[in-house]
């Protein structure tokens, strides 16, 4: 039997098989030499989340921010490459940003010109934006070493509650989705220096609607127990080609 590519494509399409972006999810069975069960860890994580109102959740994390924020794809005339020419050495710089979000928006942020987040900077950030302002909130952090420092734990748990995201499961800290939204908007703005980037971040935060924060946190922490597939109007009745 001789099948051409077009016919194979029709068979695949008629059987509701579509090309999707590949997602790699790391689910190891050991961590630091000890057995771990990712699924059990996820269950315990969400069981703990259910004890709190969504209004009482604050997610904190740091992210690397490039000085040159530009889209990976852009429009250009046929036959011509899309090239952005730069002269300043500022384009090679990266900065470390730390943010805290709730359903009400960004409750605190900072952008460090040099070095990353260590325990001392984490404590300073918490004292400035979180622990002196909030009580009985659930603070969600990832498993970075600076987040697990005893001083950080003690400061948070004095008046609030602390929950660590599940290792290797970045979606358990909803702020990761916020970073994607923030950076996609920064790509549309000009500015290379540290001060220009801080100005752009300030303006971008003001422009992000409040409901976006609620959607991000609800999407991460009010997940259904079991995924229910929505009715798809484009789904076809499978054909038997044999």
List where the protein language model places each region.
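C-terminal anion-handling pockets and recognition modules
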Residues: 5-7, 11, 54-55, 175-242
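Acidic/histidine-rich, metal-coordinating catalytic segments
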Residues: 61, 135-148, 173
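RNase H-like two-metal-ion nuclease catalytic core shared by retroviral integrases
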Residues: 141-143, 164-187
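Short, aromatic/basic amphipathic alpha-helical patches
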Residues: 149-159
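Conserved short alpha-helical interface segments
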Residues: 1-30, 56, 63-67
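Surface-exposed cleft-lining segments at the edges of enzyme active sites
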Residues: 25-33, 107-120, 135-138
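Extended, low-complexity cationic-aromatic segments
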Residues: 39-128, 228-237
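RNase H-like polynucleotidyl transferase catalytic core
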Residues: 83-89, 157-174
